[in-house]
Regions:
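Glycan-recognition and catalytic cores of secretory/periplasmic carbohydrate-active enzymes
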Residues: 1-202
Length: 202
């Protein structure tokens, strides 16, 4: 159920502190946290949108397993290292499980799954997006906003709001695209990027 071959062994390795990340791999496996995020989102939607009652206990057990068997074994710094790899909106997934269960441990895990490399500078209004993989960054900010909704921590509201305004004002063509090759770029590159084979994209 972990979405990647050898997933249980992979996460045992991660939980032991052996973490080698880039984008898009963790210890050589393609985006394993991203895959867990997609499973959590699917299970949540199956329960809330399709009234599939059986989905809720599976959702809770999967979120509990990843939280207790992986996240709880890691320091905050190690989790931030894990978040270098594309991970979707895993923070948002954990807020959703908290919303459905009322069990605070899921909100605590959501807090630890907020990527500091993005929410801290964006909460301060800094545009640090140049060169970053757009598809990796965008879902984090829906997660930051969801986290704000359930905690009232305005730093995350500011991060999400500033992200929207910065992307709209500094990274978007009039037709709506905001990246090429799924990556943000600097203002001075707009004309050249119009001719790029993999852009404009949104």
């Amino acid at each position: 159920l972990l979405g990647v071959k050898g997933g249980r062994e992979l996460f045992r390795e991660v939980a032991s502190g052996k973490i080698k990340t880039n984008n898009p791999t963790v210890n050589g496996a393609w985006a394993p946290v991203y895959l867990i995020n997609k499973m959590l989102l699917g299970l949540s939607a199956a329960y809330t949108q399709c009234d599939l009652k059986e989905a809720l206990p599976i959702l809770v057990r999967l979120a509990d397993w990843f939280g207790s068997q992986v996240l709880d074994k890691l320091t905050d710094e190690q989790i931030q290292q894990l978040l270098i790899c594309e991970h979707g909106s895993i923070n948002e997934s954990y807020v959703e499980v908290y919303e459905l269960t009322g069990q605070k441990r899921f909100l605590d895990w959501a807090r630890r799954l907020n990527d500091r490399a993005m929410w801290v500078p964006l909460s301060e209004g800094k545009d640090v997006l140049f060169g970053w993989h757009a598809n990796t960054q965008i879902p984090k900010f829906t997660g930051f906003h969801k986290y704000y909704m359930f905690t009232g921590d305005r730093a995350f509201l500011l991060a999400a709001t500033n992200f929207w305004n910065i992307v709209k004002q500094n990274h978007t063509w009039v037709i709506g695209g905001n990246s090429t090759g799924e990556h943000f770029f600097s203002k001075k590159e707009f004309i050249d990027r119009m001719l790029h084979i993999s852009g404009p994209e949104t």
